[in-house]
């Protein structure tokens, strides 16, 4: 149990630090669709897709690795709450087109990156 808790906590801390760094460095570049938040969600989508594919091919790997990467790291990195707050802010400002664009970009981009992660990991593993 303690190994699982430690794996999740470590992964979450690393993911949250990366999300904070991306926001710090990139979000000021474009206020309408902050690129740090978008990149965090896209990278998280790719990583979770690749991890799912990898763990499906490596059933003998310790479960703590899955907890560290998927539950911890991807959970700490991706940010639905920040994305939601940014969209609500755009709506409150009357920027409906930007809000719709942000929703479409985050959702479709994250789904596509998850698929890309799955396919690329399966390709690398020869599956």
From Swiss-Prot:
GO cellular component: plasma membrane
Catalytic activity as recorded in UniProt: fluoride(in) = fluoride(out)
Regulation acting on activity, per entry: Na(+) is not transported, but it plays an essential structural role and its presence is essential for fluoride channel function.
Keyword Translocase set for record: no
Positions that bind Na(+): 75, 78
Transmembrane spans: 4-24, 36-56, 68-88, 99-119
Topology term for the membrane: Multi-pass membrane protein
Locations listed in the record: Cell inner membrane
PANTHER family in the cross-refs: FLUORIDE EXPORT PROTEIN 1-RELATED
Family per similarity comment: Belongs to the fluoride channel Fluc/FEX (TC 1.A.43) family.
Entry function: Fluoride-specific ion channel. Important for reducing fluoride concentration in the cell, thus reducing its toxicity.
Descriptive protein name: Fluoride-specific ion channel FluC
Organism: Pseudomonas aeruginosa (strain UCBPP-PA14)
């Amino acid at each position: 149990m303690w190994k699982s808790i430690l794996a999740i906590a470590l992964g979450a801390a690393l993911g949250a630090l990366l999300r904070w760094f991306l926001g710090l460095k990139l979000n000021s570049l474009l206020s309408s669709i902050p690129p740090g938040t978008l990149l965090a969600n896209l990278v998280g989508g790719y990583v979770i897709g690749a991890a799912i594919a990898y763990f499906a091919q490596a059933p003998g790997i310790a479960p703590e690795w899955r907890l560290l990467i998927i539950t911890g790291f991807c959970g700490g990195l991706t940010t639905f709450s920040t994305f939601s707050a940014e969209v609500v802010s755009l709506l409150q400002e009357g920027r409906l087109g930007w809000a719709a664009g942000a929703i479409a970009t985050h959702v479709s981009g994250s789904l596509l990156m998850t698929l890309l992660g799955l396919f690329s990991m399966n390709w690398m593993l020869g599956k």
